[in-house]
Amino acid sequence: MEHRLHARFTVEGVHGRMTLASQVDILNMSISGVAIKVDRALRVGGEYALNLQLQNRVITVHALVVWCVLGEIRKGAHGEAMPVYSAGMKFTDVLSPKLMELISFIDRHKIVEEHRLGGLRVHIDAPGKAMLEVPQTYRVKVISLSGMLIEMEEGLELDRVCPMEFSLKEGGDAIRFTGRIVYCVEAVDQDTRKHEIGVAFEDIDLEQKKHLADFIDSISK
């Protein structure tokens, strides 16, 4: 964010959310739920969208996290420690046509059937065929017409692109856009681990950009 083409303004009370996609390894699955490995801790009781690749199409099912534990620590490409979590999730919306597609997915990729007290589970072979949508919240600290500086718990890799939104006032309409990560640094605030992240607005329609411009004009006076 070195070449600033637009004036930047500090803001208070502006919060937003983004959706991060994580590829997951499916360990086993049943009609009622799934066990996965994922690169981040999931909140027990939280509901997430799981995108399953079925041949040339994707179905999305929603699932509730029942348990989540740290499974192992792997080494990243640069030798950094990368935690891997195991989680159990219960499907919440399978009473629909998605149920038959899910049954087909299980049957297509199963390796071993495993009979448990809670019902039949199968181990499946489907590498790279499932993505988990993980919602994250953030606080906007500084904003301009071209981007913003936000604060959130998790750090993000540079050049990552993700769908984002924020509301300029409580109860107001959300401004939705695609953001690209251009800066990320860890900041310690009263022993709380947070990250300051620079985001460039990559894809925002003209009407929403006008709302943003009007807001910036109102706080610049």
Where are these regions (language model features)?
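Structured alpha-helical
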Residues: 1-221
